[in-house]
Amino acid sequence: MDKIILIDGNSLSYRAFYAMPALKNKKGLYTNSVYGFTLMLEKILADTNPKYALVAFDKGKQTFRHQSYEAYKGTRDKTPSELVEQFGYVRELLDSYGIKYEEHFDYEADDIIGSYAKIAEKEGLEVIIVTGDKDLTQLASENIAIYYTKRGVTDIDYYTPEFIAEKYGLTPEQIVDMKGLMGDKSDNIPGIAGVGEKTAIKLLTEYKTVENVLDNIDNISGKKLKERLTEGREDALLSKKLATIYTEVPVDNKLEDLTYSENIELKRELFEKLEFVSFLRKLSQETPSEEAGEVAEENASPKKEINIVLADKNTKIDFTDSTFHVECYTEDYHNSDVVGIVVYKEGTAYIFSEEQFFTNEFVVDYLQSEITKTVYDFKKILFIAKRNGVDINGEVFDVKILSYLIDVNAKTEIDKIIFNYLGKIISSDEEIYGKGAKRTLPAQEVINPYIAEIAESISLIKPLMEEKLSEENMVDLYKDIEIKVAKVLANMEFEGIHVSKKALEEMSEEFDERIKTLEASIYALAGSEFNIASPKQLGVVLFEDLGLPPIKKTKTGYSTAVEVLEQLQHSHEIIPLIMEYRTITKLNSTYAKGLVKDITREGKIHTRYEQTLAQTGRLSSVNPNLQNIPTRIEEGKKIRKAFVPASDDRVILSIDYSQIELRVLAHIAQDAGMIDAFKHDVDIHTKTASDVNGVSLDEVTSSMRREAKAVNFGIVYGISDFGLSNNLGITRKRAKEFIDKYLETFKGVDKYMTDIVDFAKEHGYVETLFNRRRALPDINAKNKIVANLNARIAMNSPIQGTAADIIKIAMVNVFEYLEKTNVDAKLLLQVHDELIFDVNKDIEEEFTKEMIKIMEEAANLDVQLKAEASSGASWYDAK
């Protein structure tokens, strides 16, 4: 039987756009939707080998359905401009395949597809409909199957009458009845309020159609349901009508016109223009030609099956020009099993268990040699090597870190990197292992080819990244800072920090008592007991029982968000108690109780650092997050009392940079006033208040200094008069006057802010003093809100990013000193601008001086960096 494929062009374009990474060609044209559409088309044509094909598109926003219901599809968001610009290229793609496309005023793509499907079915063809929209499933029949793209563009459910019966217990014809009862949010079809899918299916199982359900309301049990059906009668009938596909559109083509034949040259031209390297490579293999195009020639290489060898501790490998990959069951490699380690070289993948890998003398020699290691996620690999008693030497080429440096906006999961650089889709972590409670370890027959393909892909990506890194002048940033920081972090993670379980439990007992006291006080003021943690119940108490003025409403009731409570804190004495209750319960659950589960048998907590997450270059801490322990309130600070040295003859030493971002700003902006203040060690906030208010340093009041401090720290974040007035509780007029006077006083800062935004608009990025680049693709956006946000990022990123680079350089230099001298001290934690050490008391004074020197010499600025130290019997005592 001959086949015809009918493709929902709009649906698939949207699905591809949101499923694919935000790909662009070198000219800045978004290409992700076209790429995903091409993937889908290639797969469908290869899988089905149809004789006929057609793609249907929507034409215009209004259809005959709007005459019945003006709000039809009225809740849909505006199509993103990044997708709109690709629609024309999707049509060019279809031209290159020789596939016709069709659109009609007054009808939707679904109607066109439905009309052709019925014509083709009558002619005895097998009909395959490809869509990301379940509306078309109503057309399923013995000869019509719907290929529904449920996730991405190549993950498909096959809707046949049998599948629909199994999934819903309904026939395809009843799909419109189901939508008549339950509605369809995506199309703004109302349905009957309060009737969901389960109820609709139950009713249709018994009564078959919407009309029959409505005719039998008296026989249906449930008072509330009867009321809903009675009140929603007209909506149900209208909704069914809206959901029903019209199958008599006056179509443009006869079936015999829908045969297709690809045009290789058109394909090649389009793929070269859009820079679809993998498709060009495939094209060059299928149609070898001297004029295969530069991109195809450069990247063409015949696809070979990877030879998989199960290796053990005796396997000998020549590691020159190899890549290796360590695959863990979960991303938490501190506690995860290694499911396989693969070494890839020249088409062969050697797969080891963790034990066999690290007991293989050839492997250990390789790891400790100066041979370059090409990997994904060096920090993880080094941590796992250390737990096996092995260190890693030599240069390291880490595609995860490099992907992050080259495009800080790109995702760094290995499947995303492979797609971005090779245009190749491999299974995602979720597809291999599952998600959440359904996560399971598949058989080695699944794992081995998967990790082999990853290792092979890493080897192919390496030369592409090397070229890009050099182009963007970030070789030194990678070699001198980032890859060395990865080694420091792996060692810090492996070392961990001692935490007193007893101290945490004592704090938790104190918090429990305080929570009980707060609850009693809150209940007394409220006049009744209620769940304080429930926003809904709290909203009723505050805004109905106590009569406080509502500030904001949500879908479920009154908003009791922190910003709402802050506005109300002087309105009633219950508000400060509720705010304190929230603070104490959070400290108790997250830290006093929460951290206990993270303490290992050795009495330590091993946080994990994210090196490729923050767009500014800063490090973050997870599992647990030790950077977010609150320090503005005493109860939060006390959590740090539990973080202690390894023994009584040691101390916790904290050294942090003083006002590093302002010092960086003074240097980059070359502001004479700021530079002078720092050079003469004048308090920068007092100096700012003095200059802006036109008073002497001695005349600066605490409120003046507070205003100056807020502007100093907020100015390069693009703080507005509105933001400053909220922060300080002053009028917008006063805030504007202060900002204007500030910029008039610090002309270098004002000039920097203007110049850096102009640079970003011209070049599309900004960078730090150490060439860390942050792309700003939307700096010239027509949307003023988006453009202004990017302008603020442009002002801030060089400052915050340079500060991040400096602390990283300091970490590298500190770690190298520790390794070189073998001094009795350990680097334990990094928290923003602060380094935490465990130090023997006997060497504390000398060691502290050396660390301050190293940190203050990490960068050569026109303003001297300043590091300040403190120590004590715990992290709390060291501050």
Regions found by a protein language model. Give the residues of each.
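Extended, highly charged clamp/arch subdomains and adjacent linkers
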Residues: 1-56, 61-73, 85-88, 233, ...
